[in-house]
C-alpha cells in the first residue's frame, strides 16, 4: 500500500507515518535499478520547478529503505559515516533507532527524504509521493516547522458530518467551470468548517496546524507532479476522502491540496504573501472577499446541496459503533493492566488512517512503532499515545516474557541490555526503567 508522511522532525522526536505492508522477514523489496529510477524521477521533478514554488529547491538527499531488512539505497553518501558506493548510488543498513517510512529523517549528518520500498510505479501517485516527501525535508527552511495536533472533533458525529460535507463542497468547487458556481461551492465548504469551529473552539488551531504540515505537503506533491489531469484526480481523491473511517490524522491530505489549488486560482501569489500563521481556509475567504456564516440555518441550507441527510444518517450509525469501540479501548488501555513505555524523544512511525482519539488521554494508533533509548516497542494492535507524546501504553493482560523483552496481544517489546520491565504505578501495571548498577 502507499505510504504518506504525517509528521516529521518534531522537537527531539522523529515521527513518521506508514501504511504497513505484510512482508516476510528477509524478503527484499529493494533493488538498485528501481531506486535509481526513483532518484532520477525525483530530481527531474524538482529541477523542473526551479525553486519557483517555495523559493527553495526540493532536490537533495534521498534514500529508499526496505522495512523487512532495513537495507537502503541512497543518492548521496553519509556525512558522519561513509556508505558503500555501488555505481552512482550508495548502500547500507539503517539502525533500529531510525523509523522506516515515507518521511523526512535526520541521520548520518543529513536530513533525508526517506521512502519505503517498493516505491509505487502508479502515476500520478508516484510523482505525488516523491514531491510530498521531498517537501517535508525542506519545510523548516520555508517557515513551516513540522508539528502535530490532535483532532478529537473529527471523531465526533458532528465533526465527521461537517468534514464530509466540506470535502464534497471542495470537490464541487474544483470541478466547477462556472465562476459563480465555484464561488458558491467555496462558500459552502467554508460554512461547514465555520460551523464546526463554533461547536469545537479548539478545532481551528488544530486543523490549521495539520494543514500547514501534511496539507501543504500533499498540495506540493500534486502541484509538482506534472499531472496534466491534476484537478480531476484531486476531485477523485476528495471522493475517496468521503469514505475514510478515521480522519484524526488523515483529513489534511484531502483538505490541504484542495484549498491550495483553489488559492492558486483566487490569489496566485498566496505562497509569497502568506505569513505562515493564517489558515488556508481563512486565506481563501479573504482572497475572495467572502463573509462566512456559521449558524445552523446557513449549515442546513448549504448541506441540502450535498445530501446532508444521507451523511447524517450514516454518521449516526457510525457513532454507535464508535462508542462501543471507545468503551473497549478504554477497558483495555486505561482501566485494565497496562505496560506504559516512556517515549519522550523517541522515534515513531504509525498509520494515519488507523488513529482514534481517546478523549483527553491521547490517540489510539492501530499500528505504531516507537524506538527509544530502552529499545523498540512494535504495536500492531492499538497503542495509546498520550497527548504530550510522553507515554505509549499497551494492554498488558496475557503478556509473556521473551528473550528480547515482552510480548503481548498485538505488540512486542525489545529491550536493550541496560533496561528492564518493572512494576508500574498501579498493581498489575508495568513500565520500563534503566537497570540499577550492580553492587560492587
Residues covered by each model-derived region:
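Bacterial N-terminal signal peptides
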Residues: 11-21
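N-terminal mature-domain "stem" immediately C-terminal to a signal peptide or N-terminal signal-anchor/transmembrane
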Residues: 27-86
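Catalytic zinc-binding patch centered on the HExxH motif and its immediate surroundings
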Residues: 89-109
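Short pre-active-site segment immediately N-terminal to the catalytic Zn-binding motif
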Residues: 115-129
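Active-site recognition of the HExxH zinc-binding catalytic motif
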Residues: 128-140
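Post-HExxH zinc-binding segment in Zn-dependent metallohydrolases
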Residues: 141-199, 203, 207-233
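Active-site-proximal alpha-helical
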Residues: 201-231, 238-300
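Non-catalytic terminal regions of proteins
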Residues: 272-440
Amino acid at each position: 500500500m502507499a505510504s504518506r508522511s504525517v509528521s516529521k522532525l518534531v522537537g527531539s522526536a522523529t515521527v513518521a507515518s506508514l501504511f504497513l505492508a505484510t512482508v516476510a522477514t528477509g524478503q527484499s523489496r529493494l533493488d538498485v535499478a528501481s531506486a535509481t529510477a526513483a532518484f532520477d524521477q525525483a530530481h527531474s521533478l524538482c529541477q523542473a520547478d526551479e525553486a519557483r514554488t517555495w523559493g527553495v529547491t526540493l532536490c537533495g538527499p534521498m534514500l529508499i529503505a526496505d522495512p523487512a531488512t532495513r537495507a537502503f539505497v541512497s543518492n548521496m553518501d553519509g556525512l558522519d559515516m561513509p556508505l558503500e558506493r555501488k555505481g552512482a548510488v550508495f548502500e547500507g543498513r539503517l539502525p533500529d533507532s531510525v523509523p522506516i517510512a515515507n518521511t523526512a529523517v535526520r541521520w548520518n549528518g543529513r536530513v533525508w527524504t526517506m521512502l519505503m520500498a517498493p516505491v509505487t510505479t502508479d502515476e500520478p501517485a508516484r510523482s505525488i509521493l516523491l514531491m510530498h516527501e521531498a517537501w517535508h525535508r525542506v519545510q523548516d527552511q520555508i517557515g513551516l516547522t513540522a508539528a502535530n495536533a490532535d483532532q478529537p472533533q473529527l471523531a465526533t458525529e458532528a465533526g465527521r458530518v461537517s468534514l464530509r460535507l466540506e470535502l464534497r463542497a471542495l470537490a464541487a468547487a474544483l470541478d466547477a467551470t462556472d465562476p459563480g458556481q465555484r464561488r458558491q461551492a467555496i462558500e459552502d465548504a467554508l460554512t461547514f468548517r465555520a460551523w464546526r469551529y463554533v461547536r469545537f473552539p479548539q478545532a481551528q488551531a488544530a486543523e490549521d496546524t495539520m494543514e500547514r504540515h501534511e496539507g501543504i505537503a500533499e498540495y506540493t506533491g500534486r502541484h509538482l507532479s506534472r499531472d496534466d489531469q491534476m484537478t480531476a484526480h484531486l476531485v477523485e481523491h476528495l471522493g475517496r476522502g468521503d469514505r475514510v473511517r478515521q480522519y484524526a490524522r488523515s483529513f489534511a491530505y484531502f483538505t490541504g491540496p484542495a484549498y491550495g489549488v483553489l488559492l492558486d486560482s483566487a490569489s496566485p501569489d498566496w505562497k509569497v504573501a502568506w505569513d505562515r500563521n493564517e489558515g488556508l481556509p481563512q486565506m481563501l475567504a479573504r482572497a475572495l472577499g467572502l463573509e462566512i456564516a456559521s449558524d445552523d440555518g446557513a449549515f442546513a441550507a448549504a448541506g441540502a446541496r450535498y445530501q446532508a441527510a444521507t451523511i447524517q444518517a450514516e454518521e449516526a450509525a457510525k457513532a454507535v459503533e464508535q462508542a462501543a469501540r471507545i468503551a473497549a479501548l478504554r477497558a483495555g488501555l486505561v482501566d485494565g493492566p497496562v505496560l506504559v513505555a516512556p517515549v519522550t524523544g523517541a522515534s515513531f512511525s504509525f498509520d494515519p488512517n488507523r488513529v482514534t482519539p481517546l478523549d483527553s488521554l491521547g490517540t489510539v494508533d492501530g499500528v505504531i512503532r516507537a524506538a527509544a533509548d530502552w529499545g523498540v516497542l512494535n504495536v500492531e494492535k492499538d497503542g495509546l499515545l498520550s497527548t504530550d507524546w510522553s507515554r505509549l501504553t499497551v494492554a498488558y493482560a496475557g503478556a509473556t516474557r521473551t528473550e528480547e523483552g515482552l510480548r503481548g496481544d498485538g505488540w512486542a517489546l525489545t529491550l536493550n541490555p541496560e533496561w528492564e520491565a518493572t512494576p508500574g504505578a498501579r498493581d498489575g501495571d508495568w513500565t520500563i526503567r534503566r537497570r540499577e548498577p550492580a553492587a560492587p
